Each structure stands twice: as structure tokens, then as C-alpha cells.
Amino acid sequence: MKYYLAPLEGITTYIYRRAYHQHFAPMDKYFTPFLVPHTKKGFSTKEKNDVMPEYSPGMNLVPQIMSNQAESFLHTVEKLKVYGYEEVNLNLGCPSKTVVSKGRGSGFLADPDGLDRFLDEIFKKCDVKISIKTRIGKDDPEEFARLLDIYNQYPVEELIIHPRVQKDFYKNQP
């Protein structure tokens, strides 16, 4: 079994990850809080601190990207490659209403055709491994069969499944 430290916005910053890694049983993989791509500017200081390898020594750190625009996703991957990253994680699990209202995170699951086009483009053009964190649907668990058919078309490094739909947030039974 592998153990991963999932990102919690505002909590699992590089300071938390480093302290955890030094004082507790190390995780097999650590994920950064999600980065929202900005095509016209670089990383903020906070984002840079979270992805700088020297702030996470000895950790298998994977930057998480939240986007519904292939060009922005790919641009962010190029910026991360400068730091030596060979894997990124696509966040399709965040249930926040502000995220979902923009069609990002688990909001992107409501548009399976758009998601398929997005994945097609990023997998054709990206030369790093891509893992995906997903929920089982936006509104109904029955959506997962279609989503799984889409994911199975691509060389996904790893599929991390949060067994709830977006509208459940973090409540109800998984």
C-alpha cells in the first residue's frame, strides 16, 4: 500500500510538508496545493515556495494543477519542468463552488466531451507523466462509468478517486 499526503489549501504548504516529512513516517508521495494557471504571469511567491524542490528535500513531490484550458495547463507544465518535475497531477476533485462555477475541479466533470478534448490535447502535447485526482461525478455516481471510459483512453500515470460526487462536498458516505 502507498501513502500520499493530499493537499489541503492553506494547510499543507511546503512548511507543513517539510515538518511532517522530518518528524513522522514519510509519505510515498506529496501533492502540492493546486496551482491555477495564469498564462500571462509566472508563479506567485506562495506558489513558487510550494513547488521549489529545495524546500521539499527528499520528498517525492507532485505539483497539482487545476485547469480546464489545455493551453494554460501545458504552459504551467513547461514552467514546472524548469524545476525538474517529471509528473503533474490534474485536479478534477475540488468541490468548492467558486471553483466549480468556473468549470474547474469537479465542475469540469459536468462536461465530459470538453474533458475528453482537454485530455486528448494535453496527453498529445505533454512529455511528463500526468496523474488525475477525480470525483465519481458532479451530481450522480452513475456519471463515473462515462468518466472512466474517458480516462481509460489516455496513458494516465495514476487515477486517484475520491468516491463522492461534487455536490456531496466532504459529507455523506463515500
Segments from the language model and where they lie:
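Flavin-dependent oxidoreductase catalytic cores
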Residues: 1-174
